[in-house]
Amino acid sequence: TDATPEQVHRIFSNSRIIGRRFKIVHVVFSGQNIIEVTTFRSNSTAKKGKINPTRVSAESGMLLRDNVYGKSIVEDSQRRDFTINALYLDPVKKEIYDYNGGLYDMQNGIIDIIGDPDTRYSEDPVRMIRALRFSAKLGFKLSKRTSDPIKRLSALLLEVSNARMFEEVIKLFITGHGYNSFKILRKY
């Protein structure tokens, strides 16, 4: 949506804004069902010499905060991690919008990162773990450009907070695909 998290939260009283790095809204329906609502993201950056408090990065390039909002699905799709996570559904028209080849990758069992892998992994090193988790869970292969930088850039994971790493590692093993996750982790 092009609505900000704060606007979504005002519309749905049964919601809460979560995340510091990437704000999203969890809307609770029927007691337990959670719908995750995200605002379109933008690739725009602060002008040279200007401070942009909505996008902050470390010296390594890791995004510490990225709440620069966009206005279009196309722009937002370029900020997603993998092509299969950049598919958009219009529930009224019952149409899927795909700007990055995600349908092809889904049909062919491929996990492919969007954009330059080195840049994208530097922005958020957890993307490396997410790639491995999706591969283990879905039985998909990592594209060469997605897998090749993982060993080389794995030290970037040391910059991720302990709490966030704990959360991501737990996800590797609670999806019912723990053995596959273990095998793929050993590979990398």
Region roles according to the model:
Residues 1-188:
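Catalytic cores of the polymerase beta-like nucleotidyltransferase superfamily
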